[in-house]
Each structure stands twice: as structure tokens, then as C-alpha cells.
Amino acid sequence: MENEYKRLVLLEGLECINKHQFNLFKSLMVKDLNLEEDNQEKYTTFQIANMMVKKFPADAGLDRLINFCERVPTLKKRAEILKKERSEVTEETSLEINRQEASPATPTSTTSHMLASERGKTSTTQEETSTAQKRKGMSEEKTDVKKIKASGKADQPPCCEGPTATCQSPISQVSSSASSNIPSAKNQKSQPQNQNIPRGAVLHSEPLTVMVLTATDPFEYESPEHEVKNMFHATVATVSQYFHVKVFNIDLKEKFTKNNFITISNYFESKGILEINETSSVLEAAPKQMIEVPNCITRNANASPKICDIQKGTSGTVFYGVFTLHKKKVKTQNTSYEIKDGSGSIEVVGSGQWHNINCKEGDKLHLFCFHLKRERGQPKLVCGDHSFVKVTKAGKKKEASTVQ
């Protein structure tokens, strides 16, 4: 089960929260994971996941991550998903144990051997209460039982030394078929049939008041049905964090003006990115709903990741940021844009409408929603269906990119 817990922590947890939330989690886990306080930025999601497996072998730190998500208002849905995934893993293990107990066949695989040890726990406990002689005759099985009991005790979440979580009793396990790719039954009923909604997206029906920081001009993209549609990107912030937003209803463009306060509901969240479509609600915030966004949140929202950190990322991770174009090489099917900063350089592959855009060396490229990919071990950023590029010419303001 250790691998399953690690999978949940990494793929359904750390990879699904935004950069600010991940930095907050690392800050709270400094003591538990012995992180360098002055150099927390260097730790990537998979490094943190590996460290959590070593520190919390019983559940790979899943309980700590769930408690963290429960304490962040915008991550409560993520906490529910992780709980259901954990229940599903436990339920599948229990069903497998029951099947093994009902079957006369002798387990031969490693998994079956582990399940047999679980059965030994029950049978040995019963025999220990009957006679001492049977206990002596089952010394080998008792050894397995002790190991299982030790593991069972470790499954209970310990008291946190820091503010990451609080002591809590184990959550009752219930049967659930939910996964990160299937929203909860409650959300499924209200989820519209919209192809823009990614698999595993979480519906947030409760209202959230945010301040608009930036918004791009609308641009065309090709939908999964091969239809040409329009959308735009935006960045919004609350009092505690910022979000990148994909807006698939361009009629809302006027509401997404800088420093405007809006209240959104019935929106989706996927991997820390908010998605607003035709069924979402976006209203002007009432005066009493106005919020004050700290300057540090605004700075973090406008900051670009270091290229060395991008290179350490997990394949599929989405990146946003402004980078200097170092080299441009036009090919038949795509264009290679080499971007560079003080920490290194990386190739950006543009195809479709991002093939041979109007830019030259020294220009600034503002990348929106580019995905990290590895080919032959080399990391590169590639465009996707919702990618967008803005070009800043030397001494000029940002402008939407155009094909030469």
C-alpha cells in the first residue's frame, strides 16, 4: 500500500495544488522533513513526496497532506478527494483480504503473501487466547503478527509538532468508487456536459471573492470537437493566495479588468488552475465583499519560476511566466524557442498558431499554460490546446503574438 499512498500524495495531492499552496505546505513541513528554511524553493514535488515516504512510512504523509488541505479554504474539495481515494485503497485491500480468506488456494504472489500475513494476525490472536501451547507452536506466525501490528499502529496519525495538522482519530472507511478522474456524486449531478472540463476537475459551487490582477486578450483555440472557440487567461487573488484562471466565456471579459473585485461560483479547479465556463457565475462583488490582497501575494503572482526549477519539475506540470528569448529556430512543423535566465535555459516548442510567432532574440515571451515534457531525458516546454503567448518587444508594451 506504500506505493498507493505515495501515488495519492504526489499525483492527486502535491501536483494538484498551485505554487503558492505548495510553498505554504513546505513551510509548515520544515521541521518534520528537516528542510532548509532559507532554501525551500529548491525542493520539488517529487522530492517532497520521497521525503514524506521516508518520514511517514505508514501512509507516506497522506494524513498530514489531508489535514493541510482541510485548513486551506480553497483546498477543502481536494481534501475530500484525497479522503475518498484513501478509503478506496483501504476498501480494495479489505476486499482482497476477504477474497483470499474465502479461497482455498494458497497465495503465491508477493501481494497474496502479505494478505496471508494479515489473516495470520486474526487467527493467531484467537489461538493466543485459547492455549499457551498453540502460541509456542506458532512462533513464526507471531513474528509476522508483530510486524503487522507495528504497521497498524503507525497508520494512526501522530500529533503534529507544528501547525500543519492536529491529532485526529482515524477516519471511518467507507466504500467509494470516486477517483481523481471522477468528481463526487454530488458534483456529477450539477456538472454540465462541457468538453472543456478536464478529467478529475472539482466543481466549486460556493462563491469565492477575488481581485483581478491580470487578463489576456481573447484568443482562438480548437476544442476537443475540433471547433474553433474563444477563451482568455486571467490571474486572480484572494487574501491568502493567487490563481491562474482559464475563462471560456469571453462575454465575461469586461469583468476581468485589473483591480476589479468579482465573486465567482460554479467554477472548476484542476491542478490548482481555476476554469470558468458558460455555466459559471461571475458577479461584481458588493462593497462589503471587497478584500485586501497583500502585496506579497501580488508579487508572487507576477513572479516567474526559475528555469532551473522548471527543469526539475514533473512531466505534465503546467507553467506560466515571462522569459527572455535567446534563440529561435523555425522548423517545418514547429518552432523551437530557447528561453534563458540566470539559472539556465530550456527549449519551448510552439506549433499551430504558436509556430513562427513574430518575435526575435532579446524579446520577452510571456507563456501561459505550457506543459513540461521530457524527450530522451531532456526537459522542454510544449504548447497545448489552451496555451497562449504574449511578446514584449524591446522598449514596447506587451502585445499579443502574431504569425509572421
UniProtKB/Swiss-Prot annotation:
Bias-annotated ranges (Low complexity): 102-112, 122-132, 168-185
Domain Pyrin: 1-88
Keyword Transcription among UniProt keywords: yes
Any one of the GO BP annotations: cellular response to interferon-beta
Keywords, sorted A to Z: Nucleus, Transcription, Transcription regulation
Biased composition (Basic and acidic residues): 137-147
PANTHER family in the record: INTERFERON-INDUCIBLE PROTEIN AIM2 FAMILY MEMBER, PYRIN AND HIN DOMAIN-CONTAINING PROTEIN 1
Name of the protein in its database record: Interferon-activable protein 205-A
Top-level taxonomy: Eukaryota, Metazoa, Chordata, Craniata, Vertebrata
